[in-house]
């Protein structure tokens, strides 16, 4: 498919041919959902922890004798039914991440790219460069009508990354970092010429 190449000044810089096998497939919502869940699971810290019966402080002595008191038998004051007792089946420190096949991850990324193209929210940029001043980049983004955009380049230029850092909902990623969650989490997906070539190599 042919796409018009735009500049950050909202000008035209020719056309680019985007491969249909990356930007023209039928989006798979189920695959994208699987990849997003996988990404979010990997991001979880997993530092949640409560103390169990064997970890809370307190005596290990039997509260009272087994029989003859008229009360229900008890073996420990650290049992979960007591106010100061341990938790039962509570959360423990663990890794929430799990494995997802590379082919599924690849198809998820291709589906996300194709969905943006199908929605008309894919923009091909000539280059993503800036002076480093946020105000200048903010004016250009406003002129383009972008309120939420992800800019993907082969490598994010240092000045451009610095200028975009303070803009809300405007993010820049290298092609190696392009992912389903961030693509779907932004309204516009802008990819530079170099970024397109990088995605071709990555998804070849």
Swiss-Prot record:
- Keywords in alphabetical order, please: Ribonucleoprotein, Ribosomal protein, RNA-binding, rRNA-binding
Q: Name one GO biological process term.
A: translation
Which Gene3D superfamilies does the protein's record reference? 3.40.1370.10
One term under GO cellular component: ribosome
Query: Annotated region Disordered: where?
Result: 49-90
Q: Name one Pfam family in it.
A: Ribosomal_L4
The record's GO molecular-function terms, alphabetically, read:
rRNA binding; structural constituent of ribosome
Q: Which InterPro entries match?
A: Ribosomal_uL4, Ribosomal_uL4-like, Ribosomal_uL4_dom_sf
The cross-references to PANTHER family, in alphabetical order and at most eight, read: 50S RIBOSOMAL PROTEIN L4, LARGE RIBOSOMAL SUBUNIT PROTEIN UL4M
Q: According to its UniProt record, which protein family does this protein belong to? A: Belongs to the universal ribosomal protein uL4 family.
What this chain does, per the entry, is described as: One of the primary rRNA binding proteins, this protein initially binds near the 5'-end of the 23S rRNA. It is important during the early stages of 50S assembly. It makes multiple contacts with different domains of the 23S rRNA in the assembled 50S subunit and ribosome. Forms part of the polypeptide exit tunnel.
Assembly information from the UniProt record: Part of the 50S ribosomal subunit.
Q: What is this protein called?
A: Large ribosomal subunit protein uL4
